[in-house]
Amino acid sequence: MIDNHRIQFERPNLPELIKENTVVDLHFHSHYSDGFNTVEAIARKAHDLGIGIAVTDHNEIRGAVEIDGYSDVLSIPGIEMTSKEGTHILIYFYHIENLEVFYKDHVIPYMGNEIMSSTTLEMEEIIKRARKFKTVIIFPHPFCGIYTGIQNSYFSEDRRERIFPMVDGVEVINSENMNKSNLRSALLGFNLGKGITGGSDGHRISQMGKVVTYATCKRSRKAFLDAIKKKKTKVVGKEIDLIRKVTSNGVKLRTNLKNYPDLVEKNLKYSYTVINSKSKEIKENVKRSLNGKKRGRQKKYRVL
């Protein structure tokens, strides 16, 4: 059964949310990978909004380490790694020192030629290595239109069934995704019974806070990450407008074509993906939910 209050597809009212909750944009990029802004600008914007921030650069941690030095901003150390299959995974750390060790021992030796390239580690191996540390592991944008989400053709149904229990949750709203993809991500998150997160996936500070994760907990890194694991978090946000999406995705697509054109070509054929699961019950739940959306299209599907 879907909880009608844990995911809201609407613009976050940040001034109200921060009164009684810890609010964090859990997916943001700096100029150290494919983002536009400096960490200083990111920290200033997060402070002005009154929210926490996770700088989750692609295969890179300098942004996460730098923002950890801003004592007036709640930051969640993290990295968005790219597996051998070209699929992304978000790894959040309770301690910045652990992120630095993980990066040195388990990322740098397996890097590709470019920072945005795939590493040489398969998804399962990345997760196993991340589990050596105190972490929260999340699948971002599972239904991303090209290939960077876990619901892509490189992962068979059987393989996904083995991988899903290995992680802590799913990113259910990503401001750079299409609405249909986010709806499917939300359904996947609920049906897996995992923790849920959301983030802007921002590459410019104007995107920060468009999607946030929040919890009624102490304003601390540990309390917030614990809330994700305990499935106490909620997510609110909307997709960015089409013009901004095209601009942002254009940069990403050029980078992706350069680094792994074979994956792009194969996965463009996979743009209309569906949730695959051995569980008949999960399949039926998803079908009913999606059919309900089509029947009620005259009413905006704002809350799941």
Task: Locate each region found by the language model.
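Ser/Thr-glycine-rich phosphate-binding loops at phosphate-binding pockets of nucleotides
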Residues: S30-H31, I53-E60
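Residue-level preference for nonpolar/small residues embedded in alpha-helices
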Residues: T38, N59, L121-E122, S181
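Hydrophobic anchor at the start of a short beta-strand
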Residues: I53, I137, I196
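Short, ordered loop/turn segments at secondary-structure junctions
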Residues: H58-N59, E80, P142, G202
